[in-house]
């Protein structure tokens, strides 16, 4: 279905900080066809609970900060995941996530006073795996990849062998002044894949007033072309095209970005793929 005369965005400055669920970049407000990314913020002194359902999507609840209990139910039964999350900030340790399949209802209740969760979803129809799967810090694969001025740390949450069918996710940590998402992915030059590739980065900086630069050159899934460089700050989000999208941390900053993407093939770099699988 084509949307005519619809204003869309491909970069959000700090997003919406209201409590509850707030969409960040979705097909409703951005040049995306399938991938949706948002945030759930809860506070026991404000919005103290969130109830949702996945519909025909697989959903990743990626806990950024705080701890919560999540109860999920579906045709397979009911399961409660207690005390998910360990971090006081995204730089302080490895993440905890929960993958939910289609036709699942869920309720999130904070354990700590506040909890902040990134939410990514993709339609899967009947192909989705129904039983929820927790991805705890010990399940996250950590790689150091690149060399020279583009060495970075990658925390692989949902790789090709993970419990999700279509969704891939992880975190990349750029040390001060260094680059990541480079060199090119193996398939970046294959423009025929553009309609099947969508990716969103959610950025965090240390210190909170820090910054980075995001280069974007290529095609969105809508075949819209992009060629720009944007300043990214703590809490920003951006759509990445099929093509070039390297990131550099500012000279006084560390940058951590969370990546969510859908792709028809694994996202690898040929130079070190044999050793590390190579992600962002």
Where are these regions (language model features)?
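Glycine- and acidic-residue-biased ligand/ion/polar-headgroup-sensing regions
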Residues: 55-83, 100, 176-177, 188-234
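Extended, compositionally biased flexible segments
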Residues: 29, 33-110
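Conserved hydrophobic/aromatic beta-strand scaffold that supports enzyme active sites
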Residues: 37-41, 60, 97-99, 119, ...
